[in-house]
């Protein structure tokens, strides 16, 4: 899956879309829960934007190459 183009903060190393269509950026690899992703205990996150919900949202996790 190809993610939309976002203006990412420099600290964002991972992006993923939740089941509701929200795209999030994470500083550390996030964990998956039943309807989306959440930051691990050492990371930060930021809401990047929203799109139509993706049926295959579990496949949206991507590392960002800086």
Task: State what each model feature region is.
Residues 40-66:
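Low-complexity intrinsically disordered segments
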Residues 21-36:
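Short, surface-exposed terminal/edge motifs of secreted or surface/virion proteins that either
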Residues 10-14, 20-23:
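Short, surface-exposed beta-edge/turn micro-motifs
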Residues 1-6:
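Surface-exposed ligand/attachment interfaces on beta-rich extracellular proteins
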Residues 7, 12, 33, 56-58:
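A generic alpha-helix propensity feature with a strong bias for hydrophobic helices
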């Amino acid at each position: 899956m190809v993610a939309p183009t976002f203006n990412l903060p420099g600290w964002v190393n991972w992006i993923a879309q939740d089941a509701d269509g929200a795209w999030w950026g994470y500083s550390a690899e996030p964990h998956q829960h039943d309807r989306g992703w959440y930051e691990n205990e050492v990371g930060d996150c930021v809401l990047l934007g929203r799109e139509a919900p993706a049926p295959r949202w579990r496949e949206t996790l991507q590392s960002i190459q800086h």
